[in-house]
Regions:
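Short, contiguous alpha-helical
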Residues: 18-63, 90, 104-142
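Acidic/histidine-rich alpha-helical segments that form the ligand environment
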Residues: 1-2, 6-8, 45, 66-102, ...
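A glycine-rich, hydrophobic loop/mini-helix early in the fold
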Residues: 2-22
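A short secondary-structure junction motif
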Residues: 8, 12-15, 53, 96-99, ...
């Protein structure tokens, strides 16, 4: 995933990075930072579920996070976070047992989730947001 995201944003200038992928949507820059924020949260949630008995996780307001000042930073900061995080996450996933993937956490708004289901969600999440960026590039002939 980190390589596909990096390819999707390669050679975009600041004006392009600050373009929303849809009307009233996040900019490319905000989207990249959101992926880093979201996947950091998910990695911590995985570790909580692996080390605690059905922990209740803390939701966060992702839209508000996307409006914070650090969302204006260069995307390279988040790309490095994503690359390092995914290296660690992939290692952890490879070491997990079938039993580990069935461990659960509780989300206060959406209920029980197994780690296997969460893994599917975040794999989709990566593809979904990367596609937002690649489709914007196609529409604008970037």
């Amino acid at each position: 995933m980190p390589k596909k995201l990096k390819a999707a944003v390669e050679n975009l200038n600041d004006e392009q990075l600050d373009t929303p992928y849809r009307p009233e949507g996040w900019t490319v820059r905000q989207t990249v930072h959101h992926i880093a924020d979201s996947h950091l949260n998910s990695f911590v949630r995985f570790k909580l579920a692996l080390t605690e008995d059905m922990p209740t996780i803390r939701p966060y307001f992702e839209d508000r996070w996307a409006e914070l000042e650090d969302s204006d930073l260069p995307i390279e900061h988040s790309l490095r976070i994503i690359e390092g995080l995914h290296a660690r996450w992939a290692y952890l996933l490879n070491e997990m047992t079938d039993e580990d993937f069935q461990k659960k956490l509780n989300h206060p708004e959406s209920g029980e989730w197994t780690l296997n289901k969460m893994l599917g969600l975040y794999a989709w999440h990566s593809r979904h947001h990367t596609a937002h960026i690649t489709k914007l590039r196609e529409r604008n002939n970037w």
